[in-house]
C-alpha cells in the first residue's frame, strides 16, 4: 500500500526495505502514544519506536521513524485533538535507524523545532547532519542550547562514553504529566510474547523458529514464540553463545528445496544452528507476566 511506502530505504537497506507497516498505540491515555515499525537484517527484526508526548500547546516527537503515510495520518489524528507538532527530538548521538528519518520527518512538520543529542556521529563515515537532510536553521543541540519543554520535561544525559570510533550518549526525558521515563537504548523491556507488530508480518519469527533451512515456514503460536526468543538473543548479543554456523556444504544441502524457492524463505538458506540451552539463555532475558527490564 502507498501509505506504507518508504522511498529512502536504500540509504539504510534494512528489512522490510521499502514497505514499513506501522502500529499505533496509546500508552498513557491523553498523554503518551507510540508508533512502531520493524527493522532488521536477515530477518533479525525488532520493533523500533517513535514516542509522541503531549506538551503544552501541542506534541513532541521523540526518536524519528520513516514518515510513511500511516505515520503522518496517525500524527495528524493526534494534532486534531492536542495541537500541532512543536518539537522533534533525536536523543542519541549515534544510531542511523532514528537519524536517517529525521530529515524527512522534519520536512513533514516544517514548523517544528528540531533537537539533537550532542556529539552526533555515524559509522563508517561521520557525515554532517545537514548532509542527512536535517535542517540546520531550526536545529538545536540538547543541553548545549537548552532543552525542549522544560516546564513539563526533565532531561538528563546518560554518558558520554568513549567508544573509540565515536561516543555513546543519550539524553533521556522524564515526562512529568504522565510520569513516564523516555529512554531509547540504555534500557529495554522484553516480554516472552512477540510484539503485536509481528501480527502484521510474522515472517521473521517463522524464519528463525526453524532448525534447518529445508523446513517450511509454519505459522503457529509456538513457532512465533520460539522465533521471538531467538530474535531476542540475536538483538541482545549479535552472536549468541548457543549459536553455531553450519558448514557451507551443510548449508547448501538443505537449500533450494521444493516449496522454499522464494525470497520470503531465502531459498532455504538458513546459516544458523542452535545448540542445546538456547531456550534457557533466552528465558533469562524475557519476562512472562511483564517485560523484564535489561540495562543495555
Locate predicted features.
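Acidic, low-complexity intrinsically disordered regions
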Residues: 2-5, 29, 111, 151, ...
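A residue-identity detector for tryptophan
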Residues: 6-9, 33, 115, 121, ...
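Cap/insert and terminal regions of metallo-dependent hydrolase folds
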Residues: 57, 65-66, 76-87, 93-108, ...
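Active-site HxH/HxHxD metal-binding segment of metal-dependent hydrolases
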Residues: 77-148
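Catalytic core of the metallo-beta-lactamase
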Residues: 1-73, 127-217, 233-243, 247-248
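Residue-identity detector for glutamine
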Residues: 4, 31, 37-39, 73, ...
Amino acid at each position: 500500500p502507498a501509505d506504507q511506502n518508504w522511498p529512502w530505504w536504500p540509504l539504510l537497506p534494512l528489512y522490510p526495505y521499502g514497505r514499513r507497516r506501522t502500529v499505533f498505540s496509546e500508552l498513557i491515555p491523553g498523554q503518551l502514544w507510540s508508533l512502531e515499525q520493524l527493522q532488521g537484517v536477515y530477518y533479525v527484526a525488532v520493533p523500533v519506536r517513535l514516542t509522541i508526548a503531549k506538551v503544552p500547546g501541542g506534541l513532541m516527537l521523540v526518536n524519528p521513524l520513516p514518515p510513511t503515510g500511516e505515520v503522518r495520518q496517525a500524527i495528524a489524528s493526534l494534532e486534531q485533538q492536542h495541537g500541532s507538532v512543536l518539537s522533534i527530538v533525536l536523543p542519541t548521538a549515534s544510531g542511523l535507524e532514528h537519524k536517517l528519518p529525521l530529515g524527512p520527518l522534519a520536512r513533514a512538520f516544517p514548523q517544528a523545532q528540531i533537537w539533537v543529542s550532542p556529539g552526533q556521529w555515524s559509522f563508517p563515515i561521520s557525515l554532517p547532519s545537514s548532509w542527512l537532510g536535517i535542517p540546520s536553521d531550526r536545529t538545536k543541540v540538547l543541553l548545549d542550547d537548552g532543552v525542549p519543554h522544560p516546564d513539563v520535561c526533565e532531561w538528563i544525559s546518560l554518558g558520554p562514553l568513549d567508544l573509540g570510533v565515536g561516543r555513546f550518549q543519550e539524553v533521556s526525558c522524564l515526562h512529568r504529566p504522565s510520569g513516564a521515563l523516555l529512554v531509547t537504548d540504555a534500557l529495554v523491556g522484553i516480554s516472552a510474547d512477540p510484539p503485536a507488530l509481528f501480527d502484521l508480518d510474522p515472517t521473521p519469527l517463522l524464519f528463525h523458529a526453524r532448525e534447518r533451512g529445508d523446513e517450511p515456514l509454519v505459522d503457529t503460536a509456538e513457532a512465533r514464540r520460539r522465533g521471538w526468543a531467538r530474535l531476542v538473543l540475536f538483538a541482545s548479543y549479535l552472536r549468541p553463545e548457543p549459536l553455531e554456523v553450519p558448514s557451507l556444504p551443510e548449508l547448501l544441502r538443505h537449500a533450494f528445496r521444493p516449496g522454499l524457492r522464494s525470497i520470503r524463505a531465502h531459498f532455504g538458506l538458513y546459516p544458523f544452528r542452535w545448540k542445546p540451552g538456547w531456550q534457557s539463555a533466552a528465558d533469562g532475558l524475557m519476562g512472562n507476566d511483564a517485560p523484564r527490564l535489561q540495562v543495555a
